Regions:
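Alpha-helical transmembrane segments of multi-pass membrane proteins
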Residues: 2-452, 456-468, 479-600
C-alpha cells in the first residue's frame, strides 16, 4: 500500500512539474506582451521602446536563469512562493508603468528625459524578467531530475508560450482590455499554485494562494473602473479609454472640446480649424467634387467640411472600428450628425486593403495620424501613393497633411518631408506643398494651379461659410516666401523615397524624436539613414577584424568558443526578429495586437 501511494505521489509531482513549465511559458509570453503594450503607451507609441524592452527583458531572464543554475534544487513550496510573488509583482508593475510619468515628475503630454525613460524600463522589466528566468531554470531542473531531458522541458515550456501568445491576440480581439488580460494572466499563475497545493495538502500555501486569487478576482471585477482610474492619471478629463488591435484609444472632453489620443499621442481634437484649411484649400484644385474618398480622421472635421461642397457621395474608410464606437457618443452634435448623413458611407477596413478595389474618385483625402511610427508610416509610402493614384479619376486629386514647422526646417525634418514628397511624386507627377505649421500636400496626374485669382474665384463661387480660408488667405499662402522656400529645401535634400521596405521617413522621425533628448542631433546631416563616413567605416572594420582575431586566437578554448558562438547566434537572431517586427508593423500596422505571436 505504501509503495502504491509513493508511485501515485511521484506521478502527481511529474504532472505538476509539467504544469509548472506550461504556466511559466504562458506567463513569460503573455506577461511580457501586457508589459510591452503598457510601455508602448507610456512612451507614446515609439516602436524603439519595443526594441529596448526586448533587450532588458532578455537581460532579466538571463540573470534569473544564471542564478538558478546553481546546484540548489528548489522544493515545491519555494516554487509556489515565487509564483505568487511574480503574480503580485506583475500587478504592481502595471500600476507603476501607468504612473511612471507622474512618479518621475513628468508634465502632461511631455517626454521624460531619455535616461529617466531607460531607468523606468529597467525597473519595469528586469525584476519580472529575472523571476521568469529563475522559474524556468528551477522548474526545468525539477523536471530533468525525473529522468527527463532539458530539451523536453523547453518544448513543454514553449507550449505554454504558444498558448500565451494566442491569448494575447485573441483576448484583445474580443475587446478585453490589456489590464484585464494582465489580471487573467496572474489568475492562471496563482491557480496553478492552488491546484498543486490541494494535491499535497499544503495548508499555508493553499490559504495564501486562495487569498491572492480572491483579491485578483475582485480586481478583475473592478478592472474597467481601475483601468479608467489609472488612465486618468495622465488624462484629467477622461471620458473613455479602450484597447483596440491597433493601439490604445483615449478620449477626453472639456469645455465642449473632445480630444482623441492614440497611444497617448494627441491625434485629433474638435475645436480646430485645421480640417477647414485642409479640406477647402485642397479641393480648390479641382472643379469635380462628385465622389470623395476619406481615409481616416473623418470624425475630426473632414466630413462636415466636405458636406459644405456639392458632393454626391463620400466613402469614409476607418481602420479602427473600436475608435468610432467609443467616440460617437462623445462627439459634438454637428460632427456626430455628419457621420450619419445620407451621402456618407462609413466602411471599416484597412485603407490599403480598401484601395485594392477598383473604385475611382474625384478626390482622395488622407486623414491618417502623423508618420510618427512604423504603423502610421505605411500611409505615406511610395506603395500607398501608387494605390491612391490608381483609385483617382483622370483629373482627380490626392491630399494629406503632416505636422511641420512654419519658419525653420531642421535637416531631419527636411529629409523626412522630402522623402514623403518624392514618394508622392513617383506616382503623381504634379505636387504642391502648402506652407504652415501643418504642411498640406496636394498631388494630381493633371496639372495643378498656383493662380490665386482662379483659386479665389472658385472659392467665391462655392459660397462657403469659413472661419479661416478666404481669398486673402489663399493669396497669402501661395505668394509668401515660405511657399518658394519649401521647393528649395526639398530640392536640396538627398532625394530619398519613402517606401515600405526603405522607410526613410520613419528613420528621420525617430531622429526627430531623439533630438528632444539630444539637441546636438539637430545638426546631424542625415542620421540613421546613411552609411558612416569613411573614417568611421574604417574604425568599424577594424573592430570587426579585432573581434574575429580574438576569436581565432582563443578558438582552442571550448568555453570561449561557446560564448562567442552563442553571442553571435543571439545577436543575429535578435536583429532578425527586430527587423521582422518593424517590417510587420510597417506593412500591417497591428503590432499592438500581434506582438505576442511575433515574439513567440
Amino acid at each position: 500500500m505504501f509503495l502504491v501511494k509513493r508511485i501515485f505521489i511521484n506521478q502527481m509531482r511529474i504532472r505538476n512539474d509539467i504544469i509548472y513549465l506550461i504556466a511559466v511559458g504562458f506567463f513569460s509570453i503573455l506577461g511580457q506582451v501586457v508589459i510591452l503594450r503598457e510601455l508602448n503607451v507610456a512612451f507614446y507609441g515609439i516602436e524603439l521602446i519595443y526594441i529596448l524592452s526586448f533587450a532588458f527583458w532578455l537581460v532579466g531572464t538571463a540573470v534569473g536563469a544564471a542564478i538558478g543554475r546553481h546546484s540548489y534544487i528548489p522544493e515545491e513550496k519555494t516554487i509556489h512562493i515565487v509564483f505568487i510573488l511574480s503574480a503580485i509583482l506583475f500587478i504592481v508593475n502595471i500600476i507603476f508603468i501607468r504612473g511612471i510619468r507622474n512618479l518621475f515628475g513628468g508634465v502632461q503630454g511631455g517626454y521624460l528625459p531619455f535616461t529617466t525613460q531607460i531607468f523606468g524600463l529597467l525597473i519595469a522589466l528586469i525584476p519580472i524578467g529575472l523571476l521568469a528566468g529563475l522559474l524556468f531554470q528551477w522548474t526545468a531542473k525539477r523536471f530533468v531530475l525525473k529522468n527527463e531531458t532539458l530539451a523536453k522541458a523547453y518544448a513543454i515550456e514553449s507550449v505554454g508560450g504558444v498558448l500565451g501568445a494566442l491569448c494575447s491576440t485573441l483576448f484583445l480581439n474580443f475587446g478585453i482590455s490589456n489590464f484585464s488580460i494582465g489580471i487573467i494572466c496572474t489568475l492562471v499563475f496563482v491557480s496553478v499554485v492552488i491546484f498543486s497545493s490541494f494535491n499535497f495538502f499544503n495548508k499555508p500555501m493553499k490559504f495564501t494562494s486562495t487569498i491572492v486569487a480572491v483579491i485578483l478576482l475582485v480586481l478583475f471585477g473592478l478592472s474597467h473602473r481601475l483601468d479608467l482610474l489609472m488612465t486618468s492619471w495622465n488624462h484629467p478629463f477622461l471620458v473613455e479609454s479602450v484597447d483596440t488591435p491597433y493601439n490604445r484609444v483615449t478620449i477626453t472632453s472639456s469645455e465642449k472640446q473632445t480630444c482623441v489620443f492614440e497611444d497617448d499621442v494627441l491625434s485629433y481634437e474638435t475645436q480646430t480649424i485645421s480640417a477647414e484649411e485642409f479640406v477647402q484649400m485642397s479641393t480648390l484644385q479641382t472643379n469635380n467634387v462628385d465622389t470623395v474618398l476619406v481615409l481616416g480622421g473623418g470624425f475630426a472635421g473632414i466630413i462636415p467640411e466636405l458636406l459644405k461642397l456639392p458632393i454626391k457621395r463620400i466613402d469614409y474608410v476607418e481602420i479602427n472600428k473600436n475608435l468610432i464606437g467609443a467616440l460617437q457618443k462623445h462627439l459634438p452634435a454637428y460632427l456626430s450628425n455628419s457621420l450619419q448623413d445620407k451621402k456618407v458611407n462609413i466602411i471599416y477596413n484597412d485603407p490599403r486593403k480598401f484601395l485594392r478595389y477598383p473604385y475611382l474618385y474625384d478626390i482622395i483625402l488622407v486623414g491618417m495620424p502623423e508618420p510618427m511610427s512604423a504603423q502610421a508610416n505605411r500611409f505615406y509610402t511610395k506603395e500607398f501613393f501608387e494605390q491612391c493614384a490608381n483609385s483617382l479619376k483622370g483629373k482627380g486629386i490626392l491630399a494629406f497633411k503632416i505636422q511641420s514647422s512654419e519658419n525653420i526646417w531642421t535637416r531631419q525634418m527636411t529629409e523626412r518631408n522630402a522623402g514623403i514628397f518624392y514618394a508622392l511624386k513617383s506616382s503623381l507627377e504634379n505636387v504642391i506643398v502648402l506652407p504652415g505649421v501643418v504642411n498640406i500636400f496636394i498631388a494630381a496626374k493633371s496639372k495643378l494651379t498656383t493662380d490665386t485669382k482662379l483659386l479665389s474665384k472658385r472659392f467665391i463661387e462655392r459660397n462657403l461659410e469659413t472661419k479661416l480660408v478666404s481669398p486673402q488667405y489663399i493669396n497669402y499662402i501661395y505668394t509668401n516666401d515660405r511657399f518658394t522656400e519649401i521647393k528649395n529645401l526639398i530640392s536640396s535634400s538627398l532625394n530619398n523615397i519613402n517606401s515600405d521596405f526603405h522607410p526613410v521617413c520613419y528613420s528621420y522621425t525617430i531622429s526627430l524624436w531623439l533630438t528632444k533628448f539630444f539637441p546636438n542631433l539637430t545638426f546631424s546631416e542625415s542620421p540613421l539613414t546613411t552609411f558612416p563616413k569613411p573614417g568611421k567605416s574604417i574604425l568599424l572594420f577594424l573592430i570587426i577584424i579585432l573581434f574575429i582575431g580574438i576569436f581565432l586566437v582563443l578558438r582552442k578554448s571550448v568555453l570561449i568558443k561557446r560564448i562567442v558562438l552563442v553571442f553571435a547566434a543571439g545577436f543575429i537572431g535578435m536583429t532578425i526578429e527586430i527587423i521582422l517586427i518593424l517590417l510587420y508593423q510597417n506593412k500591417n500596422g497591428i503590432l499592438f495586437r500581434d506582438i505576442g505571436l511575433l515574439i513567440m
